Amino acid sequence: FQAEDGIRDRSPSRGLGDVYKRQAQLAVQGKHSEALIQKLCDTPLGEIGYYHFRKAKIYNFECIIARTGYTGEDGFEIYIDSKYAESVYKSLIEEGKPFNLQPIGLGARDTLRMEMGYALYGNELNENCNPLEAGLGWVIKLQKNDFLGKAALKKQKDAGLSRRLVGIRLLDRGVPRPHYRVLNEGSLIGELTSGTFSPSLNAGIGLCYVSTEYTKLGTKLDVEIRKQKVPAEVVKLPFLPSRVKKTNC
């Protein structure tokens, strides 16, 4: 919405229309996602590179298929007119039975994105942080022409960051949650922006903004869970290896 306001301010003569209410998104993630969707679509999905998309048809329903996701797995996101979404969803569920396809909700997706260290708007991303602090400097091209926020980002990069987003793994039993306090030698140094139990790691994990002096891998911390200090340490992100197919075609 900030981008929308910026466009309206800088180019008031250009029209903007809301299309998201007319569009639905279906995300199919996992190692069999390409084979499954290919059964419903004539477009050669193997030719779609990571973070690329193509216009396509599924059962004669026009859609956009992107090789993107929020899980750390190879997968696709299908953008389609909302009135066709239910039919396509049911077809995916039926055709997905041989692949053991399972419908999942936001809870499962949130665990997967946390294991990848992916930032979530409202948690790791808001008006009080920036892409450099969040580890998203790879999406910022400061050598490009002027864009909203460029001057501020360049100034901060030149001066050096005062804090960074880090991954934290519990060393003892416990389930960390957002806003739990993070301590170093008894002193408060931050609070978790996200936290959960990782079934893959069999450990509690979380994300937190801390001063750069605490960002070194292996730094010992404590997470306060129900008034108890649970030992933790700063670990490398992502928590698990990514399995996205990053080869661009």
Where are the language model's segments positioned?
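Conserved, structured C-terminal
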Residues: R14, D18-C249
